[in-house]
Amino acid sequence: MDFTSDYAHRRMVKFLTIILIGFMTVFGLLANRYRAGRRERFRFSKANLAFASLWAIAFSLVYGRQIYKEYQEGQINLKDATTLYSYMNITVAVINYVSQMIISDHVAKVLSKVPFFDTLKEFRLDSRSLYISIVLALVKTVAFPLTIEVAFILQQRRQHPEMSLIWTLYRLFPLIISNFLNNCYFGAMVVVKEILYALNRRLEAQLQEVNLLQRKDQLKLYTKYYRMQRFCALADELDQLAYRYRLIYVHSGKYLTPMSLSMILSLICHLLGITVGFYSLYYAIADTLIMGKPYDGLGSLINLVFLSISLAEITLLTHLCNHLLVATRRSAVILQEMNLQHADSRYRQAVHGFTLLVTVTKYQIKPLGLYELDMRLISNVFSAVASFLLILVQADLSQRFKMQ
């Protein structure tokens, strides 16, 4: 990879970051002001906080009034996946507004101290991996909302054909707000993953050179002074990599912790959506096979869309967290594969220090200090959801057969 493409990658990441900060400010989710060239780039702003407060109050009043009106008219049906999904996203959006205003000062300090672009300059990002990550992020932030908008349009054409399509955008907006911080969390982890991949490539290059220098033919070819000089240079580079790894671990933890509440709420929403989605599909089939009612194909299709989105959201997040953990374990494996038999003492010290750092921290994703988010945890959660679904289905079938 040449320096031109590496510079283009950094510019791309910087451009996407600026767009993200701009959208967060416009929608009232960032009550801080950005000032380029200052030591504290992000500073708490009372004007931005007032703007965010107006957003929060207006959003709560508009959508709270809608829920209250539907409750009075008896239109709330929590067995419907789309209705439950909408209510949950409205709730999460309000919580996001309030939580972001409470921690706005903390967020400003964290963002100001993160050496984000300095760290990017240290590493060359792989083109293929970066583009795949950006595509996945765009699928999550753009393709999923568009798919849900299509489902809303189909549902409105079926239930309220006289209403304007603007109403579907009104229903989609809470979903965008509720997922905004979650998408920021996802994007931050994508960047961390790419930096860890780049760091591992640097370690692999060192592994090849260190092991090559200690082969028998190479020991005879180079003088002891040359090897000592080369090992000292490699040790300096390894210390720099360890320093960058520590920065990644410390600052990403400080950034992800205040954002993790939104992620946990989003996971809860998706798990409830999966439960109701599967139950709605079963309910439609049971009505047809047992009660003899006509099968609601369009309603099942709409429920299937929301069910698929929830499954895809959890799958993407789980795989990303798993890739982060695998990348961290890969760093430890590379360090352990280094042959230190004829290495300089300075280099041995650098390797042992870096190994200790990696094995102790392990870069575990622990939202709010809770369980480590990985494939095992998600599989256990899915097992619990499946068990709960079986209980619901069994109870419904028992009631249906009693009525006959």
UniProtKB/Swiss-Prot annotation:
* Parts of the chain on the Extracellular side: 33-43, 155-171, 282-296, 398-404
Q: Which InterPro entries match?
A: 7TM_chemorcpt
Q: Which UniProt keywords apply?
A: Cell membrane, Membrane, Receptor, Transducer, Transmembrane, Transmembrane helix
Residue ranges that the UniProt entry lists as topological domain Cytoplasmic: 1-11, 65-133, 193-260, 318-376
Cysteine-cysteine disulfides: none
Where is this protein chiefly located?
A: membrane
Q: What's one Pfam family the UniProt record gives for this protein?
A: 7tm_7
Q: How does it sit in the membrane?
A: Multi-pass membrane protein
The protein's name = Putative gustatory receptor 94a
Its gene is Gr94a
